[in-house]
Amino acid sequence: MPDGFQLGPIFIRFYGIILMSGALAGGWLAAREAKRREYDPEIVWDLLIWLIIGGVVGARLWHVFTPSPSAIAEGRTTIFYLTHPFDLINIRNGGLGIPGAVIGGIIALFFYTRRHGLNFAEWTDISAPALALGQAIGRWGNFFNQELYGAPTNLPWKIYIDPQHRLPGFESQAYYHPLFLYESLWDLANMALLIWLMRRYGERFKSGDIFLVYLIVYPVGRFFLDFLRLDASQLGGINANQTFVAVVAVLSALALLWRHREEIGRN
């Protein structure tokens, strides 16, 4: 499967095009929500630049510090990246972790809103559905890179993986679960839920609640999907991403309950 095309002296990868498309689609959705809340939509496009920078840096660092077993087998360990600066910043072939992207984006958003006198919590709400949409689109970059596929399967929606992209021990297996597709669909459902909650029950939510819902829904889906993942990052024998998202989901649920404890008590 081709993973890009030649444009003069430059090889353009579909992975990068799709990631940028996801960012722009997310920006469009966030701009609509900002306008609905009577903010200047141009704020979103100015902010988006910083979110992309923060997200990419965070995503790369997450990958560097939680390398997958296949990356480690190829010698691309944390120490390798830290001692090879060019490889550290080379993301043309992937190597980005969504948990790190979210963390990096949150940090960038915090400093941007603080600098411009905006309500950080409210802007996390504005950004949440857009983030889910961006993830849903961005996951298709994994399709062209032939990565983030699940266990072997013969289900009708199985995907073929070229031999050079199959993991060690699975060389004879040709068809796999399209794990990227499952996560993309989950992200779309998350986006739809967040938009519905904002429009239907917006007056009941406090600033930051919608983002907390995002931090519950996405991690729950990611937690269960990771059981199908063949090349999950390990730290001390523990699935790093699965453990992290489980902790985030629990803490976010507790935070949401705590913020509405008085209403819950009255009911």
Model-derived regions, located:
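Hydrophobic, membrane-interfacing alpha helices
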Residues: 1-267
